[in-house]
């Protein structure tokens, strides 16, 4: 079943009141943010989507696929759900090389494209300041390297059309580029975030409050331009962190580079 869009049918907030947002449809290639204070229900919304809820969760929301109730086997079998999740706390535990992991995952997904390993690693290295090599063992990858590899792997190999991202702002990767990469591969992307770089580069953001979808804000071109400028600062800070990590000194020249930019 090709998933072209999902629709969230509103349920109830923590007080049992109907959610102000009664329906929202998200199509492939769209990036939608989920914002709100701690305890506002962001993770529950993502969980409802991951479960393809049908009024059977605490929120009573329903999730439609292509405008229809998803088949029961899609709900019961995680493999048929085809939903990928990424979080800042995910790490690899398998004792194998990066190349072995990519080839194994590609084989399991029926992807036999030539140079698939190089393609995934090249994309991953666009997102991290620490280059990844195919002979690196997964267990020695840093947090930023792990998340970069996961994003590239989901984009290139995974056939999951829906990607749910839970607060990757502290994951040590180029966040702006990561979201653009996933959307460019035609994924439906929902991202929980407090980060202005991520929130402002989404097409829309769902504002959560008291367990309910309070409103939807369409991102303006002005906000997207602000996001690009903040992202430049963010990438500059990432480069400074990498210099510190590798034992290099910082100079006034490092500051002047940002000022000139």
Swiss-Prot record:
SMART domains named among the record's database cross-references: AAA
Annotated residues for binding of ATP: 36-43
Domain ABC transporter intervals: 1-236
Lineage: Archaea, Methanobacteriati, Methanobacteriota, Methanomada group, Methanococci
Source organism: Methanocaldococcus jannaschii (strain ATCC 43067 / DSM 2661 / JAL-1 / JCM 10045 / NBRC 100440) (Methanococcus jannaschii)
UniProt keywords, alphabetically: ATP-binding, Nucleotide-binding, Transport
InterPro entries xrefs: AAA+_ATPase, ABC_transporter-like_ATP-bd, P-loop_NTPase
Keyword Transport: yes
Family named by the database record: Belongs to the ABC transporter superfamily.
UniProt-recorded Gene Ontology molecular function terms: ATP binding; ATP hydrolysis activity
Protein name: Uncharacterized ABC transporter ATP-binding protein MJ0121
Taxonomy, superkingdom: Archaea
